[in-house]
Amino acid sequence: MKEKTPLDAIKTIENQSSVEDLYSQLTDLSPKIVTMFTPSNRSEEEEGFLSGEVRDPQFYYEKLNSADFDEAAEKIQEIGNKILNHPSLPPSHRGIYEEFIADYSKKTTLLNYAQQYNNAKSEEEKKAAAEKYRYLNIESYGEPDEDTYRSLLGGKLNAIHSKKLTGKADELRKELFGMVNFKPGMDIPERFRPSDETVEWMHSVAESLYGGMLSHIPNEQEEFDPYELQKIFTDIIEEEFNNDSKGYAGAAEGWTVSAEKATSVNVKSSEKRIVIPDNGMMRSRKKVENLVVHEIGVHMLRSITGGETDMLPLRSGLSDYYDAEEGLGVVMEQALSGKFAERGVDHYITAGLAYYDEKDFRGAFEVKWRLSLLDSVRDGGEINDEQIEKAKKTAFTQTLRSFRGTNDIPLFKDLSYYNGSVEVWRYLESIKGDDFLLSLLLAGKVNTSADHRRVILESKSA
């Protein structure tokens, strides 16, 4: 065999895809859990469930059940190995890429287990798939803390118990207390909250950072449909990012906004795309402001700033970044209003109902709509059919978010809203107004750990 010459080695390197090209191929294989876990038959199942025709919805997941996750896992490993063995990859970057590739593999396997559960031909197969799914779900997203769950639920139940209710409201309260384990006057442990000084500091940050973006929301309008929201987002991307010569200067080139079938507004960083559900939902001005801050001002912005470095995973998210990603979005919404309020409580309670109280979809739903409705009623307040219908629709959506993918097993992905907001507020409290340390949190998709801060500090402009 002819021995390779230095010239042959040079030609081999020239013919190799770059790390950036390989990374782009890898992110094309991103485990799209939100997309895969979107039911194809939601409207029909929702109608039958809310009318009482069926006890439990049987959602069908067309994209999930037809995907080839074994092939996807093989490609992730193949491309991942090419990146890790690439001559242009700095040795100091290797560990970050290893964690990133491992996370993609883990999330792809989680989708595979959900598919196996849905397509199981026997109870034995279903049980085996369920066990594997539950384990990897907790490994990926954590599990609800029981003390926190009991505290959050107990706080709401104590408040409802102390209200002076009559008629239909009192009847619903009795029904609710018959569904949950509640002891009047139960001790509620104190939970973390940031100081007023930290909230005020973040309020000034939000006003400065997002003032230009929010100026694109028409002043004279109070409600917005999906296509009006699409235009607002598109205008912000063009004017505040691409045409801003002093600021981001074209950093959002290639980013688009579409209105299409979806369950929620979703930033798809790997595709440079923001998706808005085309379901006709009208959103208030306040809700649109929060979406601008959360979706563009956090999710999209951190992807753009991370993409401007030589550490490509900062564009998509380092390992274990997700809680802080959603947490920062929630924190910035609160910072804009200048008021702290616990967020993600409803998601946390749904997870706790399913995990600790073993409620199925119907069981969790029946608790949630009563809890939400009675939480909003004042002393002596009346409850009408319209309020009940609205509460049921909201509870259905929230319960679906928790049980999506399998219909039976709670997905803990949405714990990030509560856990992440606490993580970020604790971090902000600890840095006490340090704008530089705050800027590191906006410089890519990272969490609040010292390890992630070090990655940001050691990265270089691309």
Please report, for each region that a protein language model flagged, where it lies by residue.
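Post-HExxH zinc-binding segment in Zn-dependent metallohydrolases
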Residues: 315-359, 420
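Active-site His/Glu-centered metal-binding helix of metallohydrolases
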Residues: 292-301
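Post-HEXXH active-site segment of zinc metalloproteases
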Residues: 285-286, 301-326
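Contiguous, non-catalytic segments that form substrate-binding/exosite surfaces or channel walls
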Residues: 94-283
